[in-house]
């Protein structure tokens, strides 16, 4: 039981039935392994030492000088000399001084002087080299025996000490009584000793980089030197002062020890003991457990009594240790031990000490176990003397999970690549225990500050990913975990970014931790280079041009693309700064050539204004005669030697909407190496890969490593960096198949026996595949008499003839071949057998030899594959929104451009897909380690929004500024994350501000500093003001406000929904719980208290009302949490944060409404008191949506949600959402909303079948648009049916949009502004739009389902649309649904309604009146008055206004613009023509309907013309629709319908029917059939099909006249049929005398386009064009040619 006392401890569970498990041991930590039917063992690595390291070099850090001697000479007397100059121990210096008569010389001039001093070293330091084979590891193994002294002890009786060295890596340890355990260890120091030196100074040692050590500017001796006196570079510690005539002072610098200590800051310090160095190595061991056995498996259970010897002790690992003593008989025996929940129904927790046994009576035994969170009983022994101990464990499984994940991730980051052994990669996948131990291993104590941004992303990704994908097998989860974290370690080439190899797609992907994979080979589409700052780049180019650099050579294809994209922008910047220079970018062909110069970053940037930015996007600049050439062919004016090359390096990765952006910056210093940030190298099993954005070089192990194949998208000329090269020691450059100067890695993997470096391969092709196989149709033989190596040759000649026979001297088969776009080429060793080489196409390339370099870093950037990580795509809508939000944050200066990319990643990429189901698993994950789980079969249920929080925690981790220490610190950040999530999905105006605020506050989410607090608070207050604001936070705190400022604790509510029950069932990965099913709670109607479990037990947080199966309360009380009642749950189903209301288990059912002036009672359920009823008369709150009642009563916090009832006992609202007045009193609003109709009506399956035409005749107000339509559309989308929805007017279309919001629909009407992705399968438009589309030549999609709302509309376009739809349905091409309360043929003018309507017949005035008709104006409520024509309407409206009424007038022409005004409350009358029959919703209490209308009728006696006949009675269906404008609100019980006269079905003579036929005859169906009118309407018209068909131009004119000219159908038809074209308006003036149009009894004259003044008398007369002033005005404009 050694591990119990060690804080850093991991538990590894072996896979059941497995005979081995992998563990990683490290210093200061302890590993406990558990496997089925095996003893629990503790392993600890107690030391790693290096024996006798060899010395590499000694440095002197403190010296002294003795025996100083000087000699000097006068001018012309030669050089002075001293004997000491020959002695290696002396340091000497010659110099010249001025001499003359004053100091003993005859001549004036320079004379020589020499000074020597003896150099002895007082203090030195040594650099030593450690050989990995000299390391020795000591491990202690102890079984959990439970004996008295076992805890934290390792005496010989209990423990075995095992020494492990690289020479003997397999060791066996005999554990007395438990069998033997075999350990196969591969020691890893985690250090590359080839590159590291141990610097030893007195009794301290540091690990330093070898090159740094060798470059130290100090005197040194080689390690082999034994005398220790002949120091090299002595002068580095000695200073000679300026010489005087005969003397020169020499001084020694002080001790360099302090300087060395400063320089070594940050280097790893190494402990020493007795000349041996102690390391912090890791040991990766595989334990073979097959020879282990549990002690005492055959013993029987103990039946006697136990007593507790010592209090239960809690360890720091969440486990407990119990010490018991057996007082019964029958030892040795097994101890019965279990942990139960409080009801003693379920066994929870787990035993760490497997099979605890008593060996002898009265000797104490230690048992270690892991109880669940919360309360539990620990039961030891059997009845009668059973011990029952109550235990409470702090914390929560979710908190635990985050802690563990974070620790796992931290630890992965530290363990580095030592954790993975690529030789036996299979091991990782087969022993899942190991992967878990690695990633989720418990605490890693090392100080681990400053976790990089990427790391946070990764932790977030791990969590989020598991949340999204746990449906897959446990295997893939562990794989991905391993993958991500390793990815972070091995591939993070530089700090925050890295690349990963995808084996499947043979490609490398780069980014900062969130990898977006897409199975596209082409980098060009996924990645985009961008300069860090165009203006900096332009300034560097300007400077380079001044220095004589004439151009640039790109290193890679992507760089060339980047130059092409930004050329215009750079030119604009140059011209804004008046630099007379034009940049021109050319293409690249073949090899990417090398330039010899480089661009250097300049301290100043050029000016770059918004205007220029805008211009650069649109216009091109003028050309100057000085040019700067980028790529393109080499020219004499600009040779490669004078071009800059390799001057850019990757600075960061960011995510665009569709591509990964790679930001480039200028390099400080130039070299020949490729940029390593876009590279990776990896080994897996027997394959090795070197890859970057254009290369994929694959080698395989087949006895020896050989290069197998390589793909090149480009051939570049930089050198492959060593840091990304596998196995680079001992490489002969002449044997590297891919030449070093074409970026061939200097690696043993880059060779193939029998082939030498391919300096003259066909690299000029640029894009080629290299592998080992025969070119098609050729043979290769190995023979001595073959030609020598030469440039590669193509197997086809220039004329296309195939050369079939080839040979080589000593190559290996299959031969090396290249496949390019022009055919197949062989390697340089392979020559033609018979053909002369001159006749063949040979390679144009010769690659020179660089320097041979046989030594390299052994750093291996490892990569595990990480496929489909996050499969989301940002939709354009969200992208635009994000840009807006981010832009504001940028302007306010709270964010830099680099952060911007990160915010994009955080909010955009991870959230745009509805996160949906997968998240549940996250919550389950928490339950994996410890049993309590969600109280429902979550996997089968749909989620509630609160549970989404789990993912949010994962996502918020991304934005954290430091990894939070405790889970509670996460909560503010969590709330913000939650808001951002919500905002991006559905935005309202007030939310935008809150979101911006949230993003602004994120960087300091953990500790909001005061300044932040203030700015966030102000912002919050401004953005929250739309409804009610409270300053007493307890009663109603606006969630964003409260969470931002106070950091309330939303997780707390959530945690109460975790219950503690679960069945035990072992799973592969963690123990996956199977939760017992939980039913839906059933409550009786009444008021309830809502309690929350806190640290001190339950406390009341509010109240609520249960009615008709729905529970109602305030949103701020529960914030959407799931409620529990007697172990069953109720889930939220509707909420409105603005009104602060939420309902559970159904829509809002409280229907009482407070009437102004009535008294009410508040039934106050205060915490800790009995309910009491307080009667009061409410005041008024005025808000921008109207007035609401205000109750001035102040109860204690926790009363929110108490019901307010009226005299009839109906609940009129809830208490608790209000404001504090100036005097400090609290005033609550009566919070109430409309009763909701259950919104998922049953929908028959067969309405979606083709050939099926359904008529839904629901009464007005039954919810066709609000309830049935969304349900039908959702089902249609689910079935993938191409659907069309038709609305009669734009207004109804806009109402539909409200009901259908959130569904993917393309709105084809200007009334609705919405974003479209192009993937929607549902279209929505107006009846007339659809008919016009059918008439025009555009192809109308083949809709599978067409839904027509208000299908009683008798406009010609609507009738025609019905005809077309019914024809499509009859042909079996589609299904149709006609929604109307009054389908054609219905005869009931008084249909059913939601609320009772008082119908009353009385005399209704038909024109203005002076007296009488008081009932019209005395009515208190709002009235809708139907009038037969616009003229009558104007008359009546004027009369009503005279009587002081506020009137809104509606007609077909004004409907779209005026209808909006009826939404406000400031009107008394709406005066409307029959257009309002089409689904217009007025919140009115009365309809006045004279049941009269004007009808257009075609007169055929004499000259054919259209008159407006009437007023005449309306049809039954019109009457029913008019009456249906009221009676819609179930709460209004006294709506009135005032009518006059009876309706009449006599509309056959109406012009609309014939006009509809004119339209139908001109509609094309794909099958060429002319559609006929819908059957029930057919007898209204007697025309023959096709009678009105127009040909070619005439039809186009017909459509134009209706669409652009706004003419009635009949008139348009007459004009078009005559063959007149659209622009010709002469027909408006050449009619007969009778057709003269009058306005107020005056003949109308107008000015034509030609400037003549003519009388308006059209050739065909249609009364509709002059029946009212507006229509006439429009026709005059038409006739004048202005349309």
Swiss-Prot record:
Residues the record marks as site: Cleavage: 495-496, 847-848, 1065-1066
Which one GO biological process term can you cite for this protein? fusion of virus membrane with host endosome membrane
The transmembrane segments are 446-466, 473-493, 916-940, 947-965, 990-1010, 1012-1030, 1038-1058
- Keyword RNA-binding among UniProt keywords: no
Annotated GO MF terms: ATP binding; ATP hydrolysis activity; double-stranded RNA binding; protein dimerization activity; RNA helicase activity; serine-type peptidase activity
Write down the chemical reaction(s) this protein catalyses.
Selective hydrolysis of -Xaa-Xaa-|-Yaa- bonds in which each of the Xaa can be either Arg or Lys and Yaa can be either Ser or Ala; a ribonucleoside 5'-triphosphate + H2O = a ribonucleoside 5'-diphosphate + phosphate + H(+); ATP + H2O = ADP + phosphate + H(+)
Q: What is this protein called?
A: Genome polyprotein
**Taxonomic lineage of the native organism:** Viruses, Riboviria, Orthornavirae, Kitrinoviricota, Flasuviricetes
